[in-house]
Swiss-Prot record:
Organism: Ruegeria sp. (strain TM1040)
Name of the featured protein: Small ribosomal subunit protein uS15
Gene, per the UniProt record: rpsO
Domain of life: Bacteria
Family: Belongs to the universal ribosomal protein uS15 family.
Lineage: Bacteria, Pseudomonadati, Pseudomonadota, Alphaproteobacteria, Rhodobacterales
Subunit structure, interactors included: Part of the 30S ribosomal subunit. Forms a bridge to the 50S subunit in the 70S ribosome, contacting the 23S rRNA.
Length: 89
C-alpha cells in the first residue's frame, strides 16, 4: 500500500529545489500525491476499509495545507507543481 524507497528517492530527485532537498513543500506534496494515488486504487477494491480511508483523508488534508502554504508564499512554484503533478483540472 505504501510507496517503495526507490519511488520516494525518484520523487525527491525530480521535485527537489536544490541538491539534497528532501523537505521542501514540492517534495512533500509529490510524495503525498503518490501515496494518495496508491490508496485510491486500494479503495477501489476494498470499499469497506474505513480505517485506511481515515488515513487517506489525513493525507489529503496535509497536502492541501502544504499547497495553501506554497500558494501564499510563491504562486509561480505552486502553479508549476500542480501542473507537473496534474492534481488540478
Amino acid at each position: 500500500m505504501s510507496i517503495t524507497a526507490e519511488e520516494k528517492t525518484r520523487l525527491m530527485k525530480e521535485f527537489a529545489t536544490k541538491e539534497g532537498d528532501t523537505g521542501s513543500p514540492e517534495v512533500q506534496v509529490a510524495i503525498l500525491t503518490s501515496r494518495i494515488n496508491t490508496l485510491t486504487e486500494h479503495f477501489k477494491t476494498h470499499k469497506k476499509d474505513n480505517h485506511g480511508r481515515r488515513g487517506l483523508l489525513k493525507m489529503v488534508a496535509q497536502r492541501r495545507k502544504l499547497l495553501d502554504y506554497l500558494k501564499g508564499k510563491e504562486e509561480a512554484r505552486y502553479q508549476d507543481l500542480i501542473k507537473k503533478l496534474g492534481i488540478r483540472r
